[in-house]
């Protein structure tokens, strides 16, 4: 089934799970274009209220009665097949599209589509790029996977040909997109509940590169061997970046006491500009270089690049400062893959703290099982680890893996690690063991953030 943003203006569109990060942005784009939009969600939220104010009809709870006078129904992979609205849509032969397919159709209505892909860093980099595009007055439409202060949420509807979005590889979603510029930040083994192995993942990224038209661009991280291998299939223009390799590089890197970098940006041997970031970590130096690459493609001037990147203070849940209590700093981070955790702890180590006490909640049984050995080795930079039970998310516990097994292996590896089995137990432990000057770092994509929030109360 196809959907044309420009031609199908009379079609009424219903979103199942309209309050979700990805769905709400799509609904907002349609509302701005003049569509009649409805949607359902399990609970009321700031997002559903915002969409209601913009003209959407919002239903709380899922029911077949919600599909009144509807032509198109959009759903996400998280919606089960026995959802009453899915069943009703099939019975009535309505156009039924998943989120990725629908987003791809919306992208067709824009000329300069930017799709930010990679295993790690998509939300942060999409946010950086959005800051630069807004600084340059490109008036872009933006869909980002987290709240971004400058756009007061997770989406912005612009009135130009520029469209900026994250491109998730899970279940090959991004192969439904129509990018003019693709960005690949990195490639690692993840989502192994869907992918067979790293070669399957690389093959999917190669398909993503082949989506880009010959006059388009692929931007890739030259410090990542797997990314460079994938770029070999490109028929479009190729622009690379990196700390140590690539067309665009960072040199003379220095970090301040907050772990934020100042550095010079070179294209080959020509100095383009100097940057001072307000987000910490070497990985964010790398992420910012991809934004510079995009700025080069769209002829954005140096002042707009500097202004955009220096004004970016981070996306929510990405090394987010939560508060300080008794001279103990609390930071929350979304990292849930061993590579991300290592980068987060490396960033924390550059800051001026006494000890780093990390509370980690593994995310999904599949990821914990398939990346077990990597998880064992990724906590070397913390002084103490508090390990919570696995957050199931979309999965069921088959009894194959648990946090106690992971904790035993981490302790055998030489890291001080304590297993806890609830937020209250985690809070009790950190209250008893934190000292002045320590950093409490909550890490994970589930609800581990509650530990830090409870501590600050």
From Swiss-Prot:
EC number per UniProt: 6.3.2.8
Example GO biological process: cell division
Binding site for ATP: 118-124
Subcellular location: Cytoplasm
Keywords recorded for this protein, A-Z: ATP-binding, Cell cycle, Cell division, Cell shape, Cell wall biogenesis/degradation, Cytoplasm, Ligase, Nucleotide-binding, Peptidoglycan synthesis
Pathway(s) this gene product operates in, as recorded in its UniProt entry: Cell wall biogenesis; peptidoglycan biosynthesis
GO CC entries: cytoplasm
Family per similarity comment: Belongs to the MurCDEF family.
Name this polypeptide is given: UDP-N-acetylmuramate--L-alanine ligase
């Amino acid at each position: 089934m196809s959907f044309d943003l420009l031609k199908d203006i009379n079609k009424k569109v219903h979103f199942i799970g309209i309050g979700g990060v990805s769905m709400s942005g799509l609904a907002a784009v349609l509302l701005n274009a003049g569509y009649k939009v409805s949607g359902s969600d399990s609970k009321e939220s700031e997002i559903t209220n915002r969409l209601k104010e913009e003209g959407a009809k919002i239903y709380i709870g899922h029911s077949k009665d919600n599909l009144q006078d509807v032509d198109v129904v959009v759903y996400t992979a998280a919606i089960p097949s026995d959802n009453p609205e899915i069943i009703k849509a099939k019975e009535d032969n309505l156009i039924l599209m998943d989120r990725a397919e629908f987003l791809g159709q919306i992208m067709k209505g824009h000329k300069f589509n930017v799709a930010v892909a990679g295993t790690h860093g998509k939300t942060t980099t999409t946010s950086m790029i959005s800051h630069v595009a807004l600084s340059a007055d490109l008036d872009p439409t933006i869909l980002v996977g987290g709240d971004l202060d400058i756009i007061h949420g997770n989406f912005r509807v612009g009135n130009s040909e520029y469209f900026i979005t994250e491109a998730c590889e899970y279940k090959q979603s991004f192969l439904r997109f129509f990018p003019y510029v693709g960005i690949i930040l990195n490639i690692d083994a993840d989502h192994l509940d869907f992918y067979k192995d790293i070669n399957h993942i690389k093959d999917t990224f190669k398909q993503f590169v082949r989506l880009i038209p010959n006059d388009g661009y692929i931007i890739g991280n030259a410090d990542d061997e797997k990314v460079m291998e994938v770029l070999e299939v490109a028929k479009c223009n190729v622009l690379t970046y990196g700390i140590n390799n690539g067309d665009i590089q960072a040199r003379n890197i220095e970090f301040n006491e907050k772990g934020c970098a100042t550095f010079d940006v070179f294209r080959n041997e020509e100095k383009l500009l100097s940057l001072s970031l307000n987000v910490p970590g070497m990985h964010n130096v790398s992420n910012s270089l991809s934004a510079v690459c995009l700025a080069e493609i769209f002829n954005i001037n140096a002042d707009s690049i500097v202004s955009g990147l220096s004004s970016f203070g981070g996306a929510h849940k990405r090394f987010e400062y939560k508060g300080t209590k008794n001279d103990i700093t609390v930071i929350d981070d979304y990292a849930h893959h061993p590579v991300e955790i290592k980068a987060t702890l490396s960033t924390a180590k550059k800051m001026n703290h006494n000890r780093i006490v990390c509370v980690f909640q593994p995310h999904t049984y599949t990821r914990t099982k398939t990346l077990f050995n990597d998880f064992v080795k990724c906590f070397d930079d913390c002084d103490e680890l508090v390990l919570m039970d696995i957050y199931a998310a979309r999965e069921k516990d088959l009894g194959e893996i648990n946090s106690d097994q992971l904790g035993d292996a981490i302790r055998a590896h030489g890291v001080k690690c304590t297993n806890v089995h609830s937020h209250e137990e985690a809070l009790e432990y950190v209250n008893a063991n934190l000292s002045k000057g320590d950093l409490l770092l909550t890490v994970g994509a589930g609800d581990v953030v509650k530990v830090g929030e409870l501590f600050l109360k």
